[in-house]
Amino acid sequence: MSFHHLCSSPSSLLHDPLPLCNLLSVYPKSTPRSFLSSYNPNSSHFHSRNLLQATHVSVQEAIPQSEKSKLVDVDLPIPEPTASKSYVWVNPKSPRASQLRRKSYDSRYSSLIKLAESLDACKPNEADVCDVITGFGGKLFEQDAVVTLNNMTNPETAPLVLNNLLETMKPSREVILYNVTMKVFRKSKDLEKSEKLFDEMLERGIKPDNATFTTIISCARQNGVPKRAVEWFEKMSSFGCEPDNVTMAAMIDAYGRAGNVDMALSLYDRARTEKWRIDAVTFSTLIRIYGVSGNYDGCLNIYEEMKALGVKPNLVIYNRLIDSMGRAKRPWQAKIIYKDLITNGFTPNWSTYAALVRAYGRARYGDDALAIYREMKEKGLSLTVILYNTLLSMCADNRYVDEAFEIFQDMKNCETCDPDSWTFSSLITVYACSGRVSEAEAALLQMREAGFEPTLFVLTSVIQCYGKAKQVDDVVRTFDQVLELGITPDDRFCGCLLNVMTQTPSEEIGKLIGCVEKAKPKLGQVVKMLVEEQNCEEGVFKKEASELIDSIGSDVKKAYLNCLIDLCVNLNKLERACEILQLGLEYDIYTGLQSKSATQWSLHLKSLSLGAALTALHVWMNDLSEAALESGEEFPPLLGINTGHGKHKYSDKGLAAVFESHLKELNAPFHEAPDKVGWFLTTSVAAKAWLESRRSAGGVSA
């Protein structure tokens, strides 16, 4: 081991009773190996060299007890013992044993510890420091100086002690004393003093060594300035210093935190190949790197690799993994990691619970999110505005009205945060989805009293609420408020108006047409053509509808077509509904509605509104009838209709429940599959027989 690493373990200095200056004066210094003429981690030289001799230990790692006896400078071999320097066994029962023990170096080490404590406690001026050192009561050797500085903690007096010792003893290896002084600065996280001391070394012509750089690098990491750590690391080669693999492993973390992801991952690849020892902090940084880049599988791979290497995850790692799985919308994996955390004896902290709330809330895992919320309340943990809002948004998505009210009341009563615009928006949306008009109006009033003007999102929810309650006049009044506030309706707002029209009695639809025309003239034109039964030339409606589709965003195209088809079905205009469905197929807005295999033909409806699903069923049955009865095409053994098993966001029923009733009305031979939720199946024989009966009866509409 290089002598400059003796500073990492003061007790190791005590195995040789000789004054260190005697050893240093006899043996010449070895020439340090150069690192690289320029730092290039991709060069074959950089990747293939053994960076250290086997005995090298970094100042950044603890030294095992078994190694302490080996802490001898590779440049300074131990001299052969002479008769004058040989050890003498002392009988512990001897009356002189106590006196001899006091003279032993163990006793001297204790006195050096007390000297370090006295120097820490004295005033930071040269006179007081000199008095303490002079009052030590004996000559200080170079080894004593190293032990003393290594045990100091006061960054104000340490440089004064260093200067005093340099002047009084003229050490042969000054760099060692500088290194242990830097360790004092590292203990107090004083990077500025470390860098200033480095400059002083250069001014005095003292060449820094590996320990100098590793100490400054670790200080920079502790101070949370990874870019400075990178700067110091990249200076090493210019001073002929070569980092050990412990320092290299630490730089994975530093490069990652500094934003140089490519370098961090490059070093990590080397670490795996050369089997460096990587600590949990570095693994945590790697997980963060992959999480920020959106490589969530990479996060899990790092987690599995560290477990395979026997590195135990810490709480920070568990929290980052849970947060990453939340961002990936993988709440089931967040739940598994949380169970690992508990199984391995960790106690979840605020960050753990916050990550779980976000993970479950974003994915609409309502019961799990509420369970974590209640556990936080039981433990007296406060929530932030963002966490409250995440829970309220989840309640809106899951229509948890009572739970939303409970969370909102808790938020108002807590002293740590106040409701903001997002809070009221989510609360109003909860009530709007359930058609609770009075509660939505009360929440809107509270929002205004709190100093927040309603946003377009809020007013969209209010209109949706009035629409569900069939309060058409209030819909019109709210629309006028939007214009009065100078808010420009967007595609989603217009889609909401269109959705309200599908829930409005036909005799009142006329009140809403004017609103739609003002909000989006092209949409108003298409709606008027549907509602007012305008006679137009063939192809005109398709042209107008196509122009509408071209004018709206891709995120709302399907919603618009669903609503237009629903409106057609409500008005009993099946031909127009089929025309709009066909447009959706041509524009690839509706995809994957049908699938065919050798054993089954299927109709997939779960992404459609009720009217669009019924229209698609009508078209499919006509296609089946044409294929079987006119073209003579053979059916596969099974035919199926897949409605899905979820509920619509603003509906109490899912497609499955509605279709079960509708298929019975048609006397269709499709029956719900007991082992496949949301699937209705029939055999080819039964289907053909039913299609024959429909044709005989005059082709009753689906």
From Swiss-Prot:
Transit peptide: 1-53
Traits of the deletion mutant: Reduced plant size and pale-green leaf phenotype.
Keywords on record: Chloroplast, Nucleotide-binding, Plastid, Repeat, RNA-binding, Transit peptide
Role noted for this protein: Involved in chloroplast RNA processing. Can bind RNA. Involved in chloroplast development. Involved in chloroplast ribosomal RNA (rRNA) processing and/or translation. Required for FtsH-mediated chloroplast biogenesis. Involved in translation and accumulation of chloroplast ATP synthase subunits.
Similarity comment: family membership: Belongs to the PPR family. P subfamily.
Superkingdom to which the source organism belongs: Eukaryota
SUPFAM superfamilies from the UniProt entry: HCP-like, TPR-like
NCBIfam families named in the record: PPR (TIGR00756)
Keyword presence, Ribosomal protein: no
Gene Ontology terms describing biological process: chloroplast organization; chloroplast RNA processing; positive regulation of translation
Gene Ontology CC: chloroplast; chloroplast stroma
Sequence ranges of the PPR repeats: 174-208, 209-243, 244-278, 279-313, 314-348, 349-383, 384-414, 420-454, 455-489
Name of this protein: Pentatricopeptide repeat-containing protein At4g16390, chloroplastic
Gene Ontology molecular function: any one: nucleotide binding
Subcellular compartments: Plastid, Chloroplast
Main location: plastid
